[in-house]
C-alpha cells in the first residue's frame, strides 16, 4: 500500500511502480509528499538498491580502503572508461578520509567485447586492486578467465538503472551518475565542507 487510498506499490528489483487497486492502471513516476516535501519513491528505491547491493556481498566486489570505514561508496566502473580512470585517481583521497570504495565491473559495450574480457581478467588476477589500477591506466592485464561475478555486476547495474559509468551509489542508497572529484564526494558524504553534488535519484 501507499499513502494514497487505492494505489499500491509494485517492486521490480530496485525499481518502483504504482498500480490501481483493480489492476487496470499502472503509474511509473515519482510519488512526492507535498507536506513533508519528501520524495517517497526515491526513498523507497534507495532502500531497495542497498538491499540488492548487500545481497551481492563484498566478497563479489573489488574493495579499496579501510576495514572500518566512516562511509562507503559502491561504484559501477568500466575498465576502459576515461572518467572512471579519473575517478580512480581520486580514490586515494577518499580512502585517506576514511571512505571505503567498492568497485563493480560494468563493461558498457556488452559481454562479447575486449572490455568485458579485460574486466574478467581484472577479477581473475591474483591482486585485483593492483590489476584494476593497471587496467584503468591503460596498462596490460594478463588475460585470464575464471569463475567471476561480472555478469552479476552488470545485472545489478541494470536493476539500479545505470546508464553510464562511473555510477556511484552512496551508502544511503542515493545514486550519483558520472564523475565527481573527491572533494565533492566527501562533501556529499558529510566528511568535508565544500560544494555538494545533488544525487540524480
Task: Tell where the protein language model's regions lie, with residue ranges.
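Short active-site neighborhood of thiol/selenol oxidoreductases, capturing the structured segment around
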Residues: 64-85, 100-103
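Residue-level recognition of beta-strand->loop/alpha-helix junctions
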Residues: 105-107
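Generic C-terminal helix-cap and adjacent flexible tail
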Residues: 190-200
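Extracytoplasmic c-type cytochrome modules immediately beyond a signal peptide or single-pass transmembrane anchor
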Residues: 1-63, 70
